[in-house]
A protein has these predicted regions:
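Long, hydrophobic, well-ordered secondary-structure blocks that form the structural core
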Residues: 41-52
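Conserved phosphate-binding loops in nucleotide/dinucleotide-binding enzymes
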Residues: 8-13
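Right-hand nucleic-acid polymerase module
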Residues: 21, 126-132, 181-185, 202-272
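Charged boundary/loop elements
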Residues: 29-38
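Conserved polymerase palm-domain catalytic core
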Residues: 38, 58-170, 174-190, 201, ...
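Acidic, glycine-rich two-metal-ion catalytic cores of nucleic acid-processing enzymes
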Residues: 14-18
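Active/ligand-binding-proximal structured segments within catalytic/core domains
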Residues: 23-27
Length: 272
């Protein structure tokens, strides 16, 4: 897959997909109740739109209904799925699962994948330790496993950093505050925990602290205090895909559904 950016998608065999679904059915209810409320990726009743609306709700709270400046720290993890440390993930799972048969299966599933990251993309600390890395993007179990992995960070954020306004969707997460210095103080702790506990690194080009009024790019939309607009790159991709499609095609309808969640009246007219 190369749209919107190159990604390695690994499609399991039919037999393996059945196994992944069976494992997910057993593990999801157990782990989902351990996740924080504001983790929104690949969870029942969550999703991108719920994450965006929670972001808006927190923005209103931290700005006292938009009467004060709202600052946002936006972070993105570099090469997320390919950088998951398999040893650390298995240690987390072993702390929470007592069934040895399930653990054996998880060892087999996780250990069967090897990341195709080039040496320059692997963080220095991971190269030094020669850690087995990566989860296959495309497997149902991978979506759950990365949530289990990042739950370590979520719990740290809520219980150690005491962050009040925090939203995460997969490898994208934001912190909100009326005090810019508060976010600046949080930032080094975020870097250190991700590096030392999870062996993950932030993407240097996708981290910023800015005001909500200046526009915050999060989950494909640029958010402002009273509205959101579609990100330019997302807009171009949408037009490229729909230019030769009928208005009632499934792809066009899915985009129209997405556009309902922002200020997109003119865009909708162009799609139909």
């Amino acid at each position: 897959i190369s749209d919107p950016k190159p990604r390695d998608i690994h499609k399991a065999s039919v037999r393996d997909r059945l196994l992944h679904h069976a494992m997910h059915r057993q593990l999801y209810p157990f782990f989902d109740k351990t996740f924080i409320h504001d983790s929104y990726s690949c969870r029942v009743g969550k999703g991108t739109h719920k994450a965006m609306y929670q972001f808006f709700a927190y923005a209103r709270k931290c700005s006292h209904n938009h009467t004060r400046t709202c600052w946002v720290l936006k972070c993105d993890i570099k090469k997320f799925f390919a950088s998951i440390d398999q040893t650390i993930l298995l240690e987390i799972l072993e702390q929470r699962i007592s069934n040895q048969n399930i653990l054996w299966l998880l060892h087999e599933v996780i250990g069967s994948f090897s990341s195709s990251l080039s040496n320059r993309d692997i963080p220095t600390f991971a190269r030094m330790l020669e850690c087995p890395q990566g989860l296959p993007l495309g497997n149902l179990t991978s979506q759950l496993l990365v949530n289990i992995y990042m739950n370590e960070f979520d719990q740290y954020v809520k219980h150690q950093l005491k962050a009040k306004y925090y939203v995460r969707y997969a490898d994208d997460f934001i912190f909100l505050s009326s005090d810019k210095k508060e976010l600046e103080k949080l930032f080094p702790f975020i870097i250190i925990f991700l590096r030392d506990r999870l062996r993950l690194a932030l993407h240097p080009d996708k981290v910023f602290i800015k005001t909500l009024a200046s526009g915050v790019d999060f989950l494909g939309w640029v958010h402002f205090p009273d509205h959101r607009v579609l990100r330019t790159a997302t807009k171009k991709r949408m037009f490229r895909r729909t230019i030769e499609l009928e208005a009632d095609s499934p792809v066009a309808q899915s985009y129209l559904g997405m556009l309902k969640h922002g200020n997109t009246k003119k865009l909708k007219a162009k799609v139909v």
